Amino acid sequence: MNITYPPIKKEEIDTIYAFCKKLIDDYEDLGSIDYDKVLAWVKRKIEKRADEYKRVLMGGDLAGFYRFHEEDGEMEIDDLYILPEYRGMGIGTKVLEKCLYDTDKTVFFYVFTKNERAIKLYKSLGFTERKKVGDTRIIMAQSGRG
């Protein structure tokens, strides 16, 4: 499996935003948030931090995106999204393993509690639940291996 992780292209910001919006639409309790405010924040974050995002290419074809950055002395995986047609192929696992091996710091991320498939994967890779955030998300973490 030939997977590479080049930086995103500026014109992909809107695509990443659309993926993030889909995750919010699919898994967030929309009645409990200010939807427009959340989406505006997501858009600003992606635009401001675009240099921290990576493309996930499988054999040169776009399979997904993610952001890996330092946050309070730890490393956060943010906005990990694998395109539906590439799910179940081990690509998400490879991204997570790459992040773990790229650092010796603790790696963490937020995941929606309704995203049971992702949580099952994360637990199988040794991530544990650190903290519940509101009613819809949890933080999962694991020590880096770098």
List the predicted regions and their residue ranges.
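Acetyl-CoA-dependent GNAT
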Residues: 7-79, 83-84, 98, 131-134
